[in-house]
Amino acid sequence: LELRVAAYRSLTHSDLLALMGSRPSTQRASLYARCRLALSADARRFWDARSELIDAGIGAAGKFERYFRIFARRVLPLVHRRRTVLELLVPRSAPERAEFYDHQWDTAAWRALFRVFFSETVLGWLGRDPSFFRYAEGSVADHLLARVRHALVVLDPSVNPYVAWILTGTHGESLPHALRAEHFETIREHLDRLEWHQLPIEAVVHRDMVDRIDRANLSDIFEYMSEDNSAALLAQLASRSRPGARFAYWNMMVPRLGASLLPMRLRAMPELSRRLFLADKAFFYRDFVVDEVLP
C-alpha cells in the first residue's frame, strides 16, 4: 500500500499503470526509483530487496497474485492457445458467450487441469496460506469452476479487469476503478486521508485508534476465523460504529453472516447484498454480504 501511495504521488497515470503491471513495461525499475524517496525506510528496505517483484509489476507481488501469474504463464497454455484466450475477451452477447464457453473453452482438459491447479493441496502450497482452509466447506476447485462460468458467461469478460489479469497478466483495456484515468487526480488529491497500520484489526479497536465507524470493508477476513471469533470481532466493530453504519465482506469457502452471528446488533441487507454479488467482477467469491449496524 505504501508503494502504491508513493506511485500515485510521484508518477503520471500511464507510468502508474506500467509500475502496477496493468500495462507491459521494461521500465519498472526506473519507475520504482522515482517513487523510492517517498517511502519510509522500512518500505525502501523491503522493496530494494525485491527487484524481481518490481520487474514483474507490483500489482502481482502478493502470493495469490503470483499464483494467478503461474496459472496464466505455465498452466493455461497447456489447454488453450493464446488466440483462444484473446477470443474469449472479445465483446459478445450473453448467448454468444455461452456458445463460446460451452464449445470452445469448457473442454475436458480445461476442467481436469483446473481441478488440479486449484485443488486445496496446490492452492495451499502456492496460492494461499494453509490456514485459509481450516474452516472451509466444500470443494475449492468445484466452487471456483462454477464461478468461472458465471464470470465468462453471465458477466461480460471483455470488460472485466480481473479476468483479463488472470488470463493474460495485464488488465487490457478494462481497469479496476482505482486505476482508471478519470479517478487518478481525485485519488492523488486525497492520499493524505489514508493511514495504514500493521496490527490485528482487534487492536485498532482496543487502542482507540478509531472514533466512530461509518463504513468498514472487511474483505474476506472471516475465511481465517472461527464462528466464535467472527462474532466477537463483529461485536467489537459494532460497539465502535454509528447506528446505520455498514459492514461489507466476502465469503469464499467459509459461510459467515454477521446478522445471524450477531442478530441484536446487525441487520442483514439481503437484496442489496445479492444485487451487488451478482454484478461483482471479483468472481471467485461465493457470496458478498452487507450488514447494517442497529441503533
PLM regions with names:
Residues 2-187:
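Class I S-adenosyl-L-methionine-dependent methyltransferase module
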Residues 215-217, 241-256:
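Conserved beta-strand signature within the Rossmann-like core of class I S-adenosyl-L-methionine
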Residues 248-271:
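Conserved class I S-adenosyl-L-methionine
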Residues 269-295:
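Core SAM-dependent methyltransferase catalytic element
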